[in-house]
Amino acid sequence: MTDKKYFKQVKPFRVPTTDGKLIEEHLGLATTRTPAYSIAHMIAPPHWSEPHQQPEFDEITIVIRGRKMAEVDGEEIILQAGETLLVKSGARVKYSNPFDEETEYWSVCVPAFDINTVNREDE
C-alpha cells in the first residue's frame, strides 16, 4: 500500500484452488499485506464442501446469491441471499454448498485470513 489515505483495488488476487471454488482476495495478507482484516469475493459451485476448521479469526459471510450452509459447533445454519453470519474465532466450522446452484458471497476475516491460523482438519 502507499502513503495515501485510501487504496483502490483494481486487480484482486485469485487464490489457486482445486475444488472449483472462485476466491478473489481484495484486501488482506495476499494482496496488501494487511494483517488486521481481509475481504474476499467467492463463488462456490454446486455440491462444494471444505473440511472442518477452527480458525483463530472472526469470519463474516454475506450471501449475495444462492444459499450456503455452515455447520458451527455441530449446528447447521443455512444462509440465503441477503443474509449475514458471524462465526467467532475458535468455533469449529464447516462451510459447504450442498445445493444445486452456485453460491456467491463475500467473506470478511478479522484478523486477516491466514492459512496458518485457519486450522483445517484432515478429512
Predicted features by range, described:
Residues 33, 89-115:
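Ligand-binding loop in jelly-roll beta-barrel domains
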Residues 74-89:
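Short acidic-glycine-tyrosine-enriched beta hairpin
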Residues 28-29, 49-55, 96-98, 118:
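Short histidine-centered beta-strand/loop micro-motifs
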Residues 23-25, 39-55:
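Conserved short histidine dyad/triad with adjacent acidic residue
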Residues 1-36, 120-123:
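A short, N-terminal "cap"/entry segment at the start of jelly-roll beta-barrel domains
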Residues 56-68, 73:
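Glycine- and acidic-residue-biased ligand/ion/polar-headgroup-sensing regions
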Residues 67-69, 76, 92, 102:
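Structural motif
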Residues 48-50, 69, 85, 89-95:
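Histidine-centered metal-chelating micro-motifs
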